[in-house]
């Protein structure tokens, strides 16, 4: 007769859960010092759950917890559609491909809970059992739960690395008052490898599985203000997220799984044309990108990033659309458009200089004025040296 745990494992496979593990619900004391240190040093992104105690102690958010069930879903790393070679395109990081993974994980977790409730021997037992599902918007540090539940180990890039799927997995968990036999944690397998640390273009990784999230390109692409100039070139054409620390990891070599249809990327969504993004309406944005995890911050960060990506790709054909962005109501878009023109218009700067000078004559926002002045300086200095380019 299989145990309840064995039944859950079997059902998880039927539900399309790629990996499952069980751990106790004791406090994550090992996280306490590092979580406080991250906050004190200003390394947090601000997207984390703000109550540190609730991140460490499961009993703070769940009465009498006994176990935590951790699940992982593997996501694809390569698009099956062929990439068109036409206009300049941006890119969403792989964790934003397909339907928003939060919805997919919640669906699997709720179905798993429903199955467990069906296994109750009596109505009294069923009423006594309690569950609390959550994904990365909840209190827990998902990677710490998954590591303790035996799904994988936390790499130097701060991500959970599984034997089967590398780090290309979404994580979720269920806290319950049912006692399960815990699985064995997975020991760290990075060894002396530092490829993610040396590969990170901003030096965000601290070397011990933690990061300065403020320096992470993924974080920078999700902010709503002006992106600091140091990060703009390093962003390349990735308008949401950053996969570098995953792509360089030896555990991820050759990993590409297509288990879940709802995770499959569509080229026009995850490799969008950049120029049309600059003038996309709210309705069009919601229709094209609203179901992606990468749309959660709205269109402004993505439009700002599209202006940066066009400059990085040498998208001079988009200069007319970029000039139109100088009239945008949002200072971030006006300022970033000015910077983009300064990078792109060096060969034929006259039209851009005219637009930038007009912007200066009417602009009141200091950060926009500063960007416009820098762009004008670049274009006027390059104007005299075009023959040498």
From Swiss-Prot:
Gene3D superfamilies: Leucine-rich Repeat Variant. The active site is at 136 (proton donor). Binds 2 [4Fe-4S] clusters per monomer. Residues 181-210 form the 4Fe-4S ferredoxin-type domain. It is an enzyme of class 1 (oxidoreductase). One of its GO terms (cellular component) is cytoplasm. PROSITE patterns: 4FE4S_FER_1, 4FE4S_FER_2. The keyword tRNA processing applies. Pathway: tRNA modification; tRNA-queuosine biosynthesis. HEAT-like PBS-type repeats lie at residues 303-328. Pfam families: Fer4_16 (PF13484), HEAT_2 (PF13646), QueG_DUF1730 (PF08331). Belongs to the QueG family. This is Epoxyqueuosine reductase. It comes from Enterococcus faecalis (strain ATCC 700802 / V583).
């Amino acid at each position: 007769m299989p145990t309840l745990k064995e039944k859950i494992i079997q059902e998880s496979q039927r539900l399309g859960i790629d990996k499952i593990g069980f751990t106790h619900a004791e406090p994550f004391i090992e996280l306490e010092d590092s979580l406080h240190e991250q906050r004190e040093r200003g390394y947090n992104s601000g997207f984390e759950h703000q109550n540190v105690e609730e991140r460490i102690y499961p009993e703070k958010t769940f009465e009498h917890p006994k176990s935590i069930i951790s699940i992982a879903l593997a996501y694809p790393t390569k698009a099956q559609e062929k990439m068109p070679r036409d206009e300049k395109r941006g890119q969403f990081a792989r964790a934003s491909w397909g339907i928003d993974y939060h919805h997919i994980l919640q669906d699997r977790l709720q179905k798993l809970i429903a199955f467990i409730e069906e296994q109750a021997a009596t109505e009294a037992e069923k009423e006594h059992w309690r569950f609390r599902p959550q994904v990365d918007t909840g209190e827990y540090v998902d990677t710490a739960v998954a590591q303790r539940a035996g799904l994988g180990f936390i790499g130097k890039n701060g991500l959970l690395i599984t034997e089967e799927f590398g780090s290309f997995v979404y994580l979720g968990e269920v806290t319950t008052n049912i006692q399960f036999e815990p699985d064995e944690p997975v020991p760290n397998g990075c060894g002396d490898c530092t490829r993610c640390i040396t590969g990170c273009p901003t030096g965000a990784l601290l070397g011990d599985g933690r990061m300065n999230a403020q320096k992470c390109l993924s974080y920078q692409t999700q902010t709503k203000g002006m992106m600091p100039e140091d990060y703009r070139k390093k962003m390349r054409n990735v308008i949401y997220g950053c996969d570098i620390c995953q792509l360089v990891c030896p555990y991820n070599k050759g990993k590409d799984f297509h288990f879940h249809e709802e995770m499959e990327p569509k080229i026009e969504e995850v490799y969008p044309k950049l120029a049309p993004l600059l003038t996309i309406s709210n309705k069009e944005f919601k229709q094209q990108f609203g179901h992606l995890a990468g749309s959660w911050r709205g269109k402004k960060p993505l439009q700002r990033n599209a202006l940066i990506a066009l400059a990085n790709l040498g998208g001079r054909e988009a200069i007319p659309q970029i000039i139109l962005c100088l009239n945008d109501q949002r200072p971030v878009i006006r300022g970033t458009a000015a910077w983009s023109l300064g990078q792109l218009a060096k060969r034929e700067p006259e039209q851009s200089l005219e637009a930038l000078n007009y912007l200066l004559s009417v602009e009141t926002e200091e950060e926009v004025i500063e960007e416009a002045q820098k762009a004008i300086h670049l274009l006027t200095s390059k104007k005299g040296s075009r023959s040498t380019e």
